[in-house]
Amino acid sequence: MDRIMMKVGNEALAFYEVGAREYLTCIEHIASDPENYFYRLIPAIVNLAFSIELSFKTFINEVDAKKCRHDLQKLLECVGNPIKDILVEAVITKMKQCDAAFNEESFWAYLDQNKEAFEDWRYYYQRGKIADITFLYDMATVIINVVKRTKRAQETIEQR
């Protein structure tokens, strides 16, 4: 991960922290006040989706990143192995905590449904679509942890 990609990783972390905080607050209270907390989930969706996008972009070249724009599915497909396989497996494991039947087929179906969540939800009043906030949160959590580990490894190498 070069210096520019490390900066993108830092940006991804910032968007993740805001999105995760809002998600965790809203999920806790949405059953008691759905109208108020539904609208507070919108920034969580946008921030989590954007953090995933930026995280994926830390692992691919700039040309592919520009080509894929905000499409999470295309971005993930550009991430090389073994990172892509590790990410997919980790998200599946995390999602199984909510849905024991969640598998690789489910992963790709959910990713397809949420692939443009950033674009779909940043202007919700124009074209908000269905998004699975739990999937976005779990995926963002997994990828952010990989970005953090990669950054630490890079910093260790640079210190030598």
Describe the residue ranges of each PLM region.
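Conserved beta-strand->loop/alpha-helix structural units within folded catalytic cores of enzymes
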Residues: 46-57
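Charged alpha-helical initiation segments
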Residues: 1-44, 59-63
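Structural signal for well-ordered, non-membrane alpha-helices
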Residues: 24, 28, 52, 144-151
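Long, charged low-complexity segments
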Residues: 1-13, 17, 64-160
